[in-house]
Amino acid sequence: MPDVPIGPIYAYDTEFLEDGRTIELISIGIVCEDGREYYAVNSDMDHKRIAKDDWLCQNVVPHLPLSGKGYRGVNPYKSDTGRWVWSLDTKSTLVKPKWVIANEVREFLLAVDPPQLWANYAAYDHVVLAQLWGRMISLPKGLPMFTHDLQQLLETMADFEKPEKDGTEHNAIEDARWVMKVLRAAGKVPSA
């Protein structure tokens, strides 16, 4: 087997809408071991379906770029009909069509040698990442067909105390930063 150069380590996280049959990107955050970061929110997300999902509207949507103050200063808020009301700030430079995100993520991850990808509970994250380009076989050349799972690493380190989270949970870029912080503390990535 030929030697394949091992490139930089990237920690990433996605937030997504899933219904047991499909998984759709809401946002993606990526942190490279060299300090570069990427964060984007999918302007093509299915707003109506997300507005019906209590968990997403309580845990993910508040961390997205939102416009306006909402009802009584709350954005998102639950209407009398039981539906969540919120408005994505489409003027934010973080909000982009999925095809733009796919191109930018490809360029970001393949800027150097083939990347080594890491995520926390990585299975769904890798599917969401791969679906930026369609089917798994459509992954851009150089992107791995798997993501290393932080939880599997932590299982092998019985006495390891992982660092506390600094930021907000279910915010893709903050979650990716935390994964990188854990990888550094575990000795998988040199200290910055």
Located regions from the model:
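Acidic active-site catalytic centers that drive phospho-/nucleotidyl reactions
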Residues: 13-15, 125, 149, 175
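Substrate-recognition/cap helix-loop segment adjacent to the acidic, metal-dependent catalytic center
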Residues: 106-109, 124-144
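Acidic, Mg2+-coordinating catalytic module of metal-dependent nucleases/exonucleases
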Residues: 116-122, 127-132, 160-192
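Hydrophobic, well-ordered secondary-structure scaffolds
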Residues: 1-3, 14-21, 160-164, 183-186
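Conserved non-catalytic scaffold segment of RNase H-like nuclease domains
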Residues: 5-10, 15-119
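Basic/polar N-terminal segments that are highly enriched at the extreme N-terminus
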Residues: 1-6, 192
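Short, flexible loop segments at boundaries between secondary-structure elements
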Residues: 141-162
